[in-house]
Structure formats: structure tokens, C-alpha cells
Amino acid sequence: MATPQRRGARIRRVFWALFWLMFWTGGLVLGTALGYLHFASEGTVSRAVVAYITGETKPENAFPGKRKLTILVVGADENRDNRKRVVDSMARTDTILVAQVDFVNQRIHALSIPRDTLVRIPRHGWGKINSAHALGGPRLLVETVSNLLGNLQIDHVVIVSYKAFEEAIDALGGVTIEVEKRMVYHDNWGDLHVDLQPGVQHLNGKQALGYVRYRHSDSDFHRIERQQKFMRAVKERLKDPSVWMRVPQVLAAGLRHTRTTMEFEQLLALALFARQLSDEQIRTETLPVRNGPGTALLVKREEATQLIRELGFWDTDTYSYAR
């Protein structure tokens, strides 16, 4: 099955950076959101905002000596029982994205990895890549992704709960989108319940989460297409001036449900860097795969190697897709 190239939405505004990362269309920067709330809580918001606006928060200061920065962006949630009690905080991941920020060449390249991709998980044998987080948390997922991409060094991790998505959409006042077909799906273990009618609808946070996560009878690629379609709808929503009155609530939702290895000052620097890029300086692709056993997907090795080189993830031509 041919894998079409996936184009994510492009960062144009500071606030859009939050959604670009958090909702999976190819981003990595929620710096403004996290940085703003962090400094506000410390009582020094004015200093942080001034530094951001004037450009004092620069990558070379936040990441000394770094030419490139590779970030693993993960969308995950808790597993729950039939009574909606959390039974496992290290759930399978629904979204896996590797984004590389190139400070020298002034660009951001990102690679999304389908969650059903079959890989070798260190010390656990073969399995779908989305199970690595459940088996060993962020550390094992980082190791698995690094091995998959030719021992690529991953510098930082951002893990976003789907609760952040749900609450942020509610804070926006919902999003209008055309639902392509009847969608019904119930998963108590993953706390996912979808019941949508076809046609143009205004979705609240829970409905929107169901729309972007719905996968029953669909392939991983259909789900990715819906996620990107939804993000275009979010972008349209953000053009409404009245929405900006809701910014504090949306940012608060992102902060409450996001974990990252980066400092807030570093996130601010990334947001500033991303804000200055044009559409042509941002590229998003999907790892080339083909149908495998059952519902698993197998990496197309030659195509994957070529694509990863094109994205500039490797500093030399000696690497190749390993396993």
C-alpha cells in the first residue's frame, strides 16, 4: 500500500505552536504555553513575555553548543477499568512523532511513526511500537525509537495526555468540522467512547477526541488524515478574535496534562525559533511502511533510509534503517 506524504499545519503564531505539538500534526513546540504559565506562577510573567517578544530567549542560550535538537513527541493516556479507574499510567501510545529542530539551517523536520509499526523492542522482542511505552515507559520508548531510526540520538521527550486535547478544545468553545461517516466505537479500557453522526458538526472536547482517535474499521493512515483535517479546522477556529479571550484556559489545559524533559526557558526558546520560520522551512513526513502480519505494519527499509537522510536526521551518509 502506497504511503502518501503527510503535510502538517504550519506554525504562524505563538499560540498555534501549542496546538501544532499537542494535537500531533507535525509539531513540537508548546513553549509559549508552558513558559507563560510557569513564569506567571512565579510572579515574573512580565519579564518572561518581554524576553520572548524581544527575542532574548534564544536557542543558542537555551541549548548551548547544540546545532540540532531532536525531540520525541508522544500522545498517551492512562488505561482504565470499566469503572473508569486508572489502572496503568504507562499506557500504549497513540501518537509518536520525532521532530528535529535545526538551528543552523533554520528549519524543523518531523517524522511521524504509525503506531502499528512492527519493531524490535529492546529486551522484549518484536512488537508494535506503541507497546514500548506500556512495557517500559518513556525510557524504553526512546530506546526503541532510537534503534528504529539508526541509533538516532533523542535529546528530549514531550508526553501529552489526551486529556490536554479534550480540555483545550472545550476551552476554545469547540470546533466545527464535517464528520465523514457514522462513527460508533466504545473502549472502556482506553476510556474512549465515540458516537458521531455524519455531516457538519460543532464538536466539544470529548467528541473531538473521539473523532481524531477513531480507528474502528479504518487504517492508521485514515486516522492520521482525520487528525490533520481536524487541525486545519482548529486553525480556522483560531482566526476568530473572540477565541483569544480564551487563551489562559487553553494554556492551562496544556500545562496540567503535559510532561517534558525540557526546562520552561528552553520551551520558550523553541517557540520563538518556530515562530520565525516560514512554511517552506517546516516539513512533516510519515515513516514509509507496508502491510504486515495481522494489523502490523512493516517498515520499507530502502524508502525509510532515503527519507530519513532527506530529512537530515543523520549527520553523515553512513547510517541506514537498522531494524
Name these PLM-found stretches.
Residues 2-323:
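Non-catalytic, solvent-exposed segments at the cell envelope interface
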